[in-house]
From Swiss-Prot:
UniProt-listed SUPFAM superfamilies: Ribosomal protein S20
Keyword set includes ATP-binding: no
Biological role stated in the UniProt entry: Binds directly to 16S ribosomal RNA.
NCBIfam families in the cross-refs: S20 (TIGR00029)
Keyword Ribonucleoprotein: yes
GO molecular function, one term: structural constituent of ribosome
InterPro entries reported for this sequence: Ribosomal_bS20 (IPR002583), Ribosomal_bS20_sf (IPR036510)
Protein name: Small ribosomal subunit protein bS20
Length: 100
């Protein structure tokens, strides 16, 4: 444990930031999981309400991912990759339902 006052403060700040970053990453994962589950549900049973839910969930996920990248929780390339994956998943489920 540090003895110097400024080092003690830095330990407290690092712990606070770690917990905040952990919560942000968990929220991003939860929103991504919600989008993927909604898109698979839409592929199995296409309903217009489900499509609206997908769009709302995707918007929320994109917003949270962008905020995480802006604050430095996620790297900008990681954020771009996650957004691209979500878009690809949704596009595939929409294409599968329109083809059948």
């Amino acid at each position: 444990m540090p003895r110097i006052k400024s080092a003690i403060k830095r330990v407290k700040i690092a712990e606070r930031n770690r917990l905040r970053n952990k919560a942000t990453k968990a929220m991003v994962r939860a929103l991504m999981k919600k989008v993927t589950s909604l898109s698979s549900a839409y592929a199995a049973n296409p309903q217009p309400e489900t499509l609206q839910e997908i769009q709302a969930a995707m918007s929320a996920a994109f917003s949270r991912i962008d905020k995480a990248a802006k604050t430095g929780v996620l790297h900008k390339n990681t954020a771009a990759r996650r957004k691209a994956r979500l878009s690809r998943i949704v596009q595939r489920s929409l294409a599968a339902t329109s083809a059948s």
